């Protein structure tokens, strides 16, 4: 069977934004914002599901950084 009218319209690209809050060693609280690009399956809708990674920068002098995956 030949799919002559096959199109990639069912594949969409979306952008997801995640916000993460973390505590590092109990001596500081940081807030990070991550932006991710994902590919999702849709029908005529330009939207997708992605995974964003947020970097947590602590407010404490220790300057500890952690990474979180937001779904």
From Swiss-Prot:
Membrane-crossing segments per the record: 37-57
Membrane topology, record value: Single-pass membrane protein
Name under which the protein is recorded: Putative uncharacterized protein DDB_G0268542
Subcellular location: Membrane
Protein source organism: Dictyostelium discoideum (Social amoeba)
Entry keywords, A to Z: Membrane, Transmembrane, Transmembrane helix
Gene Ontology CC annotation, any one: membrane
């Amino acid at each position: 069977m030949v799919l002559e009218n096959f199109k990639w319209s069912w594949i969409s690209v979306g952008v997801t934004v995640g916000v993460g809050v973390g505590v590092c060693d109990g001596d500081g609280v940081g807030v990070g914002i991550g932006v991710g690009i994902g590919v999702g399956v849709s029908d005529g809708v330009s939207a997708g599901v992605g995974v964003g990674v947020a970097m947590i920068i602590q407010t404490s002098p220790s300057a500890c950084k952690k990474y979180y995956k937001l779904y």
